[in-house]
């Protein structure tokens, strides 16, 4: 249990001096089964707590989903009720407005009938009013026709004017040429910048490589110095160990000589008293031999400890040297791998740039082909629209001629009817009584005056039509002049639409000419 908590612990602990070693006591043995059961019980408690937490969270989630579902249903029903109320209110409002409108129309109709009954126009006033209304309608129709023709002419001028199209095409071609030149210059500038960047990266890579070589040389010198210092330290330790060993040997020899001299002296002193002191000599010899044996064992133990320490130091030094060599080899392999990755990255970058150039050229070619196709399509559409416009103009002109012929035939029919009415009136006048001759003569004179006024009105209408045709001709001349002026104005104020801007101008607007 102790080793599981704190890891493997060495029992031997070095003291303040080289020959002092403290042995750590063994940790007490724990109750393995009880700890295992306790661990299983804790794991079951954690598992049950996790299951309870999962069930609680699932219950909370279901409750939240149910509350959200109920809220959505309540909101849906509330919205449906409000929409239904709004629709009903709208329908009721529409019905009320319809009823008010019906009442208003009925009221206006009643007022109109009342006014007509109160007014009781005569036939002559009604004819004058109808003539005035006809004149106003003719003027209104003529004005609408002129506005429509002007609008169509302006639209035809803006969309299908050949001179304007040629001028705009020339301007567009010039701009395309200028933008292509600017694009070529921009690509050359990009290539130059890429070349400068590659040179800079090569220079930085060379500097980095030289710095790495310098660091490796310094590291090698440092490792060499460290190995030399380690070797000198090991030699010094071996020398000190040999000196200690020689001192120990000399001490053993000195002790042996001392023991021998003591034994000889004791033997010489106790030769006569051997029988009396034999027991004491035997005890003294035993004590001395035991002390000598303990001293020899202690010296041998110290020698073995020193040998083990020296072997550990040598192994540690060799291990450090091996680790340094492995690190150096790993660094060299990392540097070679980084060089390979960098070269691979440069090759991939060149391939990507070539692919981008090819893709860019392909996009330009597709854009050019698309623009040519669009221009051809526009030309075809313009020709078709021009033909349709000519057909429409011819149809309109034909309809105008037919309307004019119908109008003239109707006028002739009206004149014939009027002449017929005149003849009938004259016959009626001849059939009337003599006493009403003066009155009939006066009425005939008034009617003759009205006919003269109608003839004068018709002559004025014909002169007005001639004047209108002359004005139309002058308006056509002025429109032609305005067309030419408008062409110059459009050319002077022409701007490229946003959808026709070149992609390079959108990408780099500050590096291209305006």
UniProtKB/Swiss-Prot annotation:
It holds the Pfam family TPH. It is found in: Cytoplasm, Cytoskeleton, Cilium axoneme; Cytoplasm, Cytoskeleton, Flagellum axoneme; Cytoplasm, Cytoskeleton, Microtubule organizing center, Centrosome, Centriole; Cytoplasm, Cytoskeleton, Microtubule organizing center, Centrosome, Centriolar satellite. This is Cilia- and flagella-associated protein 53. GO terms for biological process: cilium assembly; cilium movement; determination of left/right symmetry; epithelial cilium movement involved in determination of left/right asymmetry; flagellated sperm motility; manchette assembly; sperm flagellum assembly. Transmembrane segments: none annotated. It comes from Homo sapiens. The keyword RNA-binding does not apply. One of its GO terms (cellular component) is axonemal A tubule inner sheath. Microtubule inner protein (MIP) part of the dynein-decorated doublet microtubules (DMTs) in cilia axoneme, which is required for motile cilia beating. Regulates motility patterns of both 9+0 and 9+2 motile cilia through differential localization and recruitment of axonemal dynein components. Required for centriolar satellite integrity and non-motile cilium assembly. Required for motile cilium formation. Through its role in the beating of primary cilia, involved in the establishment of organ laterality during embryogenesis. Belongs to the CFAP53 family. Expressed in skin fibroblasts (at protein level). Expressed in nasal respiratory epithelial cells (at protein level). Expressed in airway epithelial cells. It is linked to Heterotaxy, visceral, 6, autosomal: A form of visceral heterotaxy, a complex disorder due to disruption of the normal left-right asymmetry of the thoracoabdominal organs. Visceral heterotaxy or situs ambiguus results in randomization of the placement of visceral organs, including the heart, lungs, liver, spleen, and stomach. The organs are oriented randomly with respect to the left-right axis and with respect to one another. It can be associated with a variety of congenital defects including cardiac malformations. The gene is CFAP53. InterPro entries: CFAP53/TCHP, TPH_dom.
């Amino acid at each position: 249990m102790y080793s599981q908590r704190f890891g493997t612990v060495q029992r031997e602990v070095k003291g303040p001096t080289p020959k002092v070693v403290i042995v750590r006591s063994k940790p007490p043995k724990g109750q393995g089964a009880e700890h295992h059961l306790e661990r299983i019980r804790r794991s079951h408690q954690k598992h049950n707590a996790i299951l309870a937490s999962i069930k609680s969270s699932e219950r909370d989630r279901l409750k939240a989903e149910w509350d959200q579902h109920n809220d959505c249903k309540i909101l849906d029903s509330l919205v449906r009720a409000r929409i239904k109320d709004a629709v009903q209110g709208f329908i009721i409002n529409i019905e009320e407005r319809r009823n008010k409108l019906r009442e208003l129309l009925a009221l206006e109709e009643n007022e109109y009938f009342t006014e007509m009954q109160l007014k009781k126009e005569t036939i002559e006033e009604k004819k004058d009013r109808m003539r005035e209304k006809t004149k106003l309608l003719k003027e209104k129709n003529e004005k609408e026709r002129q506005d429509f023709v002007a609008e169509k002419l302006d639209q035809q001028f803006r969309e299908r004017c050949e001179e304007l199209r040629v001028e705009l095409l020339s301007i567009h071609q010039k701009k395309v040429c200028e933008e292509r030149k600017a694009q070529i210059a921009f690509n050359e500038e990009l290539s130059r910048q890429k070349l400068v960047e590659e040179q800079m990266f090569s220079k930085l890579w060379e500097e980095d490589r030289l710095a790495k070589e310098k660091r490796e040389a310094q590291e090698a010198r440092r490792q060499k110095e460290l190995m030399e210092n380690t070797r000198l330290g090991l030699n010094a330790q071996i020398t000190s160990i040999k000196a200690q060993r020689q001192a120990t040997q000399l001490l053993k020899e000195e002790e042996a000589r001392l023991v021998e001299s003591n034994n000889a002296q004791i033997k010489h002193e106790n030769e006569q008293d051997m029988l009396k002191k034999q027991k004491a000599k035997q005890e003294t010899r035993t004590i001395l031999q035991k002390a000598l044996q303990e001293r020899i064992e202690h010296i041998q133990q110290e020698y073995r400890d020193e040998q083990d320490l020296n072997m550990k130091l040598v192994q540690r030094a060799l291990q450090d040297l091996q680790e340094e060599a492995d690190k150096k080899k790993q660094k060299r392999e990392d540097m070679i791998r980084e060089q390979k990755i960098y070269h691979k990255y440069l090759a991939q970058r060149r391939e990507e740039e070539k692919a981008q150039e090819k893709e860019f050229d392909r996009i330009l070619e597709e854009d050019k082909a698309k623009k040519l196709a669009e221009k051809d399509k526009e030309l075809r559409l313009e020709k078709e629209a021009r033909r349709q416009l000519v057909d429409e103009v011819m149809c309109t002109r034909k309809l105008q001629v037919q309307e004019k012929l119908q109008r003239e035939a109707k006028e002739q029919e009206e004149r014939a009817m009027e002449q017929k009415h005149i003849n009938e009136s004259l016959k009626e006048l001849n059939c009337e009584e003599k006493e009403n001759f003066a009155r009939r003569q006066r009425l005939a004179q008034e009617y003759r005056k009205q006919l003269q006024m109608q003839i004068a009105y018709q002559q004025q209408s014909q002169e007005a039509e001639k004047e209108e045709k002359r004005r139309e001709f002058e308006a056509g001349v002025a429109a032609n002049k305005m067309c030419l002026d408008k062409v110059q104005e459009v050319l002077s104020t022409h701007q490229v639409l946003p959808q026709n801007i070149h992609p390079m101008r959108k990408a780099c607007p500050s590096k291209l000419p305006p």
